[in-house]
Amino acid sequence: MNALTVIPYAEFGIQSNFSFLRGASKPEELVVAAKLMGFSAIGLADRNTVAGVVRAWQQAKVEKLAYHPGCRLVFGDGTPDILAYPRNRAGWGHLCRMLTQANLRDETEKGATLLQRDDLLEWGDLMSLAVLPDLAAGAEDSLALLGQIKDRFGRALRLGVSPCYAGYDRFRIEQAAALAQVAGIPLMATNDVLYHTAERRPLQDVLTAIRLNTPVAEVGLELSANAERHLKPPLEMARLFRRHPQALAETLRFAEELTFSLSDLQYNYPDEPTESGLGPQAELERLAREGAARRYPSGVPHSVIKRIEEELALIERLNYARYFLTVYDIVKYARSQDILCQGRGSAANSIVCFCIGITEVGPDRIDTLFERFISEERNEPPDIDVDFEHEKRETVIQYIYEKYSSKRTALAAAVISYRGRSALREVSKAMGLSEDVRASLSGSIWGWSTSEVGEKEARAGGLDRSDPTSRHVMERANEIMGFPRHLSQHVGGFVITKDRLDEIVPIVKTAMDERKMVEWDKDDLDAVKILKVDVLALGMLTCLQRAFILLTDHYPKARDPYGQPYVLASLPPEDKRVYDMIGRADTLGVFQIESRAQMSMLPRLKPKDFYDLVIEVAIVRPGPIQGDMVHPYLRRRQGKEKPEYQKPELEAILSKTLGVPLFQEQAMKIAIVAGGFRPGEADELRRAMATFKRTGTIGNYRQRMIDGMVGKGYTKDFAERCFKQIEGFGEYGFPESHAASFALLVYASCWFKTFYPDVFCAAILNSQPMGFYQPAQLVRDARDHGVDIREVDVNCSAWDCTLEKVPFDPARILPRHADMRGVIETNHAVRLGFRQIKGLSKERMEDFAKRRGSGYETVRDVWLRSGLDVDEIERLAQADAFRSIGLDRRAALWEVRALGAKSAAEKLPLFDQPALRLRELEPETKLPKMPLGEHVIHDYRSLGLSLKAHPVAFLRERLDRAGVTPNANLPSQRDGRRVSVAGLVLVRQRPGKGNAIFLTLEDDKAVANVIFWERTFTRFRPIVMGARFVKVSGKLQSESGVIHIVAEKIEDLTPWLTVLLEKVSGAGAPGPQPMGYAKEVGSDRRSRPEIGNAPARQDLATLSEEAEQVMPKGRNFQ
């Protein structure tokens, strides 16, 4: 044979990186390599999973390579591994049922599969099987096994054998051949592949070490002895099996038996009885027409009627009516339970979705493109996303399970992959690096970064790239980036079927017993055309629903024109005062436009109407930024540049965005009108944008579009610039329909913040966790707007934050918000709820409030009547919640620690009475007053905020001496001046792959916005990423009301926070230990301190560390 000889051969049993922490190549890499090597066919077979088969199938279609999905069955009862490949659609159903049965056993842990031989015997029909026997075991046992399986499955069985490259392969293969001959089954060759190229062997070693949680140097015999488990060309396989050529030929016969393809999967939609008894299509038409009449009470416009008819006709041709009715049923149920919800995403392009109440933005408010939602050419199921209140979504989920049963519904999977930080952390651990080095390395990476780990990160983490171990760590970390770690449940994507779901895809357990998920993620499901309904959780919907309830309960005059309480759809639209507030970037806490990047854009864009909000939501995204769309749009909006339209057809598409394509729908329309794409092809372009990071296929359309535009008379330069902008959508381009759905919530949240900041503050605190900012900043912002915020108190607070009637004093509004005087209509204070105290449960505290009656009088009264344990009462004392009883934090803790049992129920009244009388005779203990700084520290520890003082206020004199400009004074500084600012780090944000990092710093009066350009960030990376309190020096930039400090230097001032404890070091008066310096909550505090003895003090270093750690760490966003 010469090098050009083509040897027919099919490789089966290939394991990809979806054999988690075993396979060292992606499915796509294996397919491409197999095509290049000239394989006749291949078959993926990951360990007890089919999670990677769709990705391999998609790549095989591109490469035009015969591909067969299968699974490597790994048993828990000693049965040797068996390769299982379905021969037809029914066989695929059997494989899925077998894996599901093993996945869902009671004794099976999440993420594991407990497969038994009986599962194979029950479900192994209609599959071709290859047993991989342990040739080191006795021949008698192997023959018994082969005989049992052959008796059950007959000619479907083979004996698979692979070389082990340990010096005795000839004997090994001869042994297998003899065993096959005696058993009467064919011998089949395989290389038991784990990676596509030998260069991946080092990565496979690292994966083994991670899986075994043992450094590579200590794994020993668990590592492969060589690098031979890679795809080998058929010619090489022929050489290895030259004494048994029939073993290679058998791979082809094995492949010929396999007629099943993933394209054979046919999804069947749920088919439930309709409300009216009509068929699905007729029912949908009825609902659409009735809904249109409600949406347009003055008469349905002819254009709307026409669009409804066109959409309904297409829905009928594609047989999608049952899908729409399924989503309608879920939304209808949610609203029957007073759960706020709305559809978003591409569904907002549909007038039918609007009419039947799935979406809330009408087509008159945006330029819709129905092909973005449904395409006859594409003939793929539509995707409707519906957001629900995040605290009530579980109610909707349980309804879905109850109605459709666990056999017909499950959540989609989410593939949790290695990103920069996790890749570095795991690989460095596998390579035996010390804990401090690992922490330094992972701390040098942006939290969710998927960018390659390079020289800058290595230097920041203290690695020397010239050191072989360090270089190995970086190389393996980059290789593992994007590899799957495990499957998790999707945030809310449900697959619902008419027939059994577990005959389409295996079902597995999740961390929640009542939930199950399939093995495929949303992209896999899209590829095989399986319907998914996204039941998503959105914190702002919870906030708005709570705000509407508070508004109705406390502001009876706040009503719509018909005298009804406001709801989302009836809020007064286009109120100038709301847009004025937005234009000033006074948007902390509101939906979507609260980030520093958004706030810096608002004064420049100055939204005036709803469509401006749609643009605002979409423009501060990596897509428009990467596509160089932001600055041209702003220049044109500000009149500094005229829009450019080469032809009227483009003006019709781009006029609303001043000639700049900001939305995916516009990109599709340009491809259709100017590039000559068909609608279905334009949607393929849109999909290429959406999956750019995973597939990188958007470049395939470049020449096609440029040639199409040039052919229609556009200049090549313009066509190239146009495609470059569209290519930017590969980094999270936003659909206009999606932005419009979000803009509705932006306006609603801003409306509440404008007129009722008390309502907004209480509602958003009661909806935590959500958003960019922590409760401390939300409370501070409300106080800046004149809202009275009151402390948590045992006699006044409920679980949630509540409103208390109080006259509103506009003078409380800070000068920088002076424009809100005369606008804000609030007349209530916000009482902080028990939910703000860390470590308390809702159920216990709601019961505590019910037992309160006319009020608790003493700590002992709380103990006797409330039902709380001493530990819970102590948490109340730590939060300084006994002020209405006349006790501050220290006094309340003294009283709590005098209680004699964990709970009052443990102490019989007969024995309790003497203690009561004895206590009455005890002398009053005079406790030293707790310093204010110490109070603030403990407020932050217990509540995450303090109403007593801001931590930076204690440092103001020292900061003034250091030349630091208070943040509130920045607006009076001239543009270009060098200044220094300081504050607690609230937020770090790095939009997309931009070369700027935004920091938000808070001092005692205001916030400052800081920009670090990449070079400066690299220089000071550890401080930027890790410090809690910093000083930044740089040049002030002021434009259109937007003020930034362009950083030149940053200093870590976190140790300065110890000033809050300065009085502690000199305290010597007798009394109990300051709160928080005793043992942690839950430890034994039953013994009462001796009166008059001074408490032991921890050293100042420990106290300093505590002062630093209790301050907020800052949140990182991309």
Swiss-Prot record:
Keywords: Cytoplasm, DNA damage, DNA repair, DNA replication, DNA-directed DNA polymerase, Nucleotidyltransferase, Transferase. Residues 1071-1118 are annotated as: Disordered. GO terms for cellular component: cytoplasm. It catalyses: DNA(n) + a 2'-deoxyribonucleoside 5'-triphosphate = DNA(n+1) + diphosphate. Gene3D superfamilies: Metal-dependent hydrolases. It is found in: Cytoplasm. Its EC number is 2.7.7.7. The keyword Cell division does not apply. GO terms for molecular function: 3'-5' exonuclease activity; DNA-directed DNA polymerase activity; nucleic acid binding. GO terms for biological process: DNA repair; DNA replication. The keyword Cytoplasm applies. It comes from the Bacteria. SMART domains: POLIIIAc. Its main location: cytoplasm. DNA polymerase involved in damage-induced mutagenesis and translesion synthesis (TLS). It is not the major replicative DNA polymerase. Belongs to the DNA polymerase type-C family. DnaE2 subfamily. PANTHER family: DNA POLYMERASE III SUBUNIT ALPHA, ERROR-PRONE DNA POLYMERASE. This is Error-prone DNA polymerase. The gene is dnaE2.
